[in-house]
Amino acid sequence: MSVAENTDGIAVPDEEMLKRHVAAEATVKSFHYEKPTGGKSAKGRVNLGKSDNIRGVVQIVKKAGGENNLHYHTNASSFWMVLKGRVRFYGPDDKVIGEFGPHEGTMTPRYARYWFENIGDDDLEILQVGAYGDPENDSSGRTDSSPQRYQIHTSDRYEGVVEPKK
Protein backbone atom coordinates (compact mmCIF):
# COMPACT_ATOMS: atom_id res chain seq x y z
CA MET A 1 0.00 0.00 0.00
CA SER A 2 1.47 3.30 -1.00
CA VAL A 3 0.62 6.79 -1.97
CA ALA A 4 2.40 8.52 -4.80
CA GLU A 5 2.39 12.23 -5.48
CA ASN A 6 1.50 13.80 -8.80
CA THR A 7 3.43 16.75 -10.15
CA ASP A 8 1.31 19.15 -8.08
CA GLY A 9 2.25 17.36 -4.83
CA ILE A 10 -1.25 15.88 -4.47
CA ALA A 11 -1.49 12.36 -2.99
CA VAL A 12 -2.58 9.74 -5.50
CA PRO A 13 -3.60 6.52 -3.74
CA ASP A 14 -2.78 3.10 -5.11
CA GLU A 15 -5.58 0.53 -5.52
CA GLU A 16 -5.29 -0.85 -1.97
CA MET A 17 -5.39 2.63 -0.41
CA LEU A 18 -8.36 3.57 -2.58
CA LYS A 19 -10.24 0.49 -1.27
CA ARG A 20 -9.52 1.64 2.29
CA HIS A 21 -10.81 5.13 1.50
CA VAL A 22 -14.05 3.77 0.04
CA ALA A 23 -14.61 1.34 2.95
CA ALA A 24 -14.00 4.05 5.57
CA GLU A 25 -16.12 6.64 3.79
CA ALA A 26 -19.03 4.16 3.68
CA THR A 27 -19.08 4.12 7.50
CA VAL A 28 -19.15 7.90 8.13
CA LYS A 29 -22.13 8.64 10.39
CA SER A 30 -23.67 11.79 11.81
CA PHE A 31 -25.37 11.99 15.20
CA HIS A 32 -27.45 14.24 17.41
CA TYR A 33 -27.48 13.95 21.19
CA GLU A 34 -30.55 14.47 23.33
CA LYS A 35 -30.73 13.41 26.95
CA PRO A 36 -33.04 10.39 27.13
CA THR A 37 -35.99 10.41 29.50
CA GLY A 38 -37.44 7.66 31.63
CA GLY A 39 -34.25 5.86 32.65
CA LYS A 40 -34.57 3.84 35.85
CA SER A 41 -30.89 3.39 36.64
CA ALA A 42 -28.63 5.85 38.48
CA LYS A 43 -26.52 6.00 35.33
CA GLY A 44 -27.15 6.00 31.60
CA ARG A 45 -25.01 5.82 28.47
CA VAL A 46 -25.84 7.19 25.04
CA ASN A 47 -23.60 5.67 22.38
CA LEU A 48 -22.89 8.33 19.75
CA GLY A 49 -20.68 6.32 17.44
CA LYS A 50 -17.54 4.27 17.10
CA SER A 51 -14.90 3.18 14.66
CA ASP A 52 -12.05 0.72 15.01
CA ASN A 53 -10.07 3.01 17.31
CA ILE A 54 -12.40 5.64 18.78
CA ARG A 55 -15.72 5.65 20.65
CA GLY A 56 -18.01 8.52 21.61
CA VAL A 57 -20.44 8.19 24.53
CA VAL A 58 -22.40 10.59 26.72
CA GLN A 59 -22.69 9.30 30.27
CA ILE A 60 -25.57 10.56 32.39
CA VAL A 61 -25.00 10.29 36.14
CA LYS A 62 -27.98 11.09 38.33
CA LYS A 63 -27.53 13.24 41.42
CA ALA A 64 -28.04 10.37 43.85
CA GLY A 65 -25.74 7.54 42.84
CA GLY A 66 -24.05 6.35 39.70
CA GLU A 67 -20.53 7.24 40.77
CA ASN A 68 -17.95 4.69 39.79
CA ASN A 69 -14.96 3.17 41.56
CA LEU A 70 -11.21 3.53 41.17
CA HIS A 71 -10.31 1.77 37.93
CA TYR A 72 -8.16 2.02 34.83
CA HIS A 73 -8.24 0.92 31.20
CA THR A 74 -5.44 -1.04 29.55
CA ASN A 75 -6.67 -0.39 26.01
CA ALA A 76 -8.23 3.08 26.06
CA SER A 77 -7.34 6.67 26.81
CA SER A 78 -10.34 8.96 27.31
CA PHE A 79 -11.10 12.62 26.81
CA TRP A 80 -13.87 13.85 29.12
CA MET A 81 -15.89 17.07 28.77
CA VAL A 82 -18.85 18.14 30.89
CA LEU A 83 -21.91 19.05 28.82
CA LYS A 84 -24.18 19.79 31.79
CA GLY A 85 -23.70 19.65 35.55
CA ARG A 86 -20.54 19.31 37.62
CA VAL A 87 -18.11 16.44 38.12
CA ARG A 88 -15.19 15.70 40.41
CA PHE A 89 -12.48 13.30 39.22
CA TYR A 90 -10.28 11.46 41.71
CA GLY A 91 -7.07 9.46 41.46
CA PRO A 92 -5.57 6.89 43.86
CA ASP A 93 -6.22 7.53 47.57
CA ASP A 94 -9.12 9.80 46.54
CA LYS A 95 -6.71 12.57 45.52
CA VAL A 96 -8.74 15.16 43.62
CA ILE A 97 -7.68 15.42 39.97
CA GLY A 98 -10.10 18.27 39.34
CA GLU A 99 -13.63 19.64 39.47
CA PHE A 100 -15.21 20.55 36.17
CA GLY A 101 -18.32 22.31 34.90
CA PRO A 102 -19.77 22.79 31.41
CA HIS A 103 -17.17 22.82 28.62
CA GLU A 104 -14.40 21.75 30.99
CA GLY A 105 -12.85 18.37 31.53
CA THR A 106 -9.82 16.15 31.69
CA MET A 107 -7.98 13.43 29.81
CA THR A 108 -7.23 10.03 31.34
CA PRO A 109 -4.46 8.08 29.58
CA ARG A 110 -4.32 4.29 29.49
CA TYR A 111 -3.36 2.79 32.86
CA ALA A 112 -4.15 6.01 34.79
CA ARG A 113 -6.35 5.12 37.77
CA TYR A 114 -9.37 7.35 38.35
CA TRP A 115 -12.99 7.57 39.39
CA PHE A 116 -15.56 10.35 39.27
CA GLU A 117 -18.82 11.49 40.81
CA ASN A 118 -21.60 13.95 40.13
CA ILE A 119 -21.16 16.93 42.49
CA GLY A 120 -23.80 19.20 40.95
CA ASP A 121 -27.42 19.89 41.79
CA ASP A 122 -28.66 18.23 38.58
CA ASP A 123 -27.89 15.16 36.53
CA LEU A 124 -24.37 15.12 35.11
CA GLU A 125 -24.04 14.79 31.34
CA ILE A 126 -20.43 14.11 30.38
CA LEU A 127 -18.98 13.38 26.94
CA GLN A 128 -16.41 10.58 26.84
CA VAL A 129 -14.32 10.13 23.71
CA GLY A 130 -12.20 7.00 24.04
CA ALA A 131 -9.20 6.24 21.84
CA TYR A 132 -8.42 2.54 21.70
CA GLY A 133 -4.79 1.41 21.60
CA ASP A 134 -5.50 -1.92 19.89
CA PRO A 135 -8.12 -1.62 17.13
CA GLU A 136 -8.46 -5.41 17.03
CA ASN A 137 -9.61 -5.46 20.67
CA ASP A 138 -13.17 -4.13 21.20
CA SER A 139 -12.69 -3.97 24.99
CA SER A 140 -11.37 -0.92 26.83
CA GLY A 141 -9.60 -3.28 29.23
CA ARG A 142 -11.40 -1.83 32.25
CA THR A 143 -9.74 -3.13 35.42
CA ASP A 144 -11.11 -2.37 38.88
CA SER A 145 -8.66 -1.13 41.52
CA SER A 146 -11.32 -0.99 44.26
CA PRO A 147 -14.77 -2.51 44.84
CA GLN A 148 -17.50 -1.17 42.58
CA ARG A 149 -19.81 1.41 44.15
CA TYR A 150 -22.24 1.04 41.28
CA GLN A 151 -22.67 -2.04 39.10
CA ILE A 152 -21.56 -0.65 35.74
CA HIS A 153 -23.40 -3.20 33.65
CA THR A 154 -26.78 -2.15 35.09
CA SER A 155 -26.80 1.31 33.48
CA ASP A 156 -29.50 2.33 31.02
CA ARG A 157 -28.09 2.15 27.48
CA TYR A 158 -29.25 4.10 24.46
CA GLU A 159 -28.13 4.63 20.90
CA GLY A 160 -27.67 8.22 19.75
CA VAL A 161 -29.84 9.53 16.93
CA VAL A 162 -27.93 8.74 13.76
CA GLU A 163 -29.21 11.61 11.65
CA PRO A 164 -28.80 15.12 13.09
CA LYS A 165 -31.72 17.52 13.50
CA LYS A 166 -32.39 19.70 10.50
Segments and roles (model prediction):
Residues M1-R55, N69-L70, R142-K166:
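A short, N-terminal "cap"/entry segment at the start of jelly-roll beta-barrel domains
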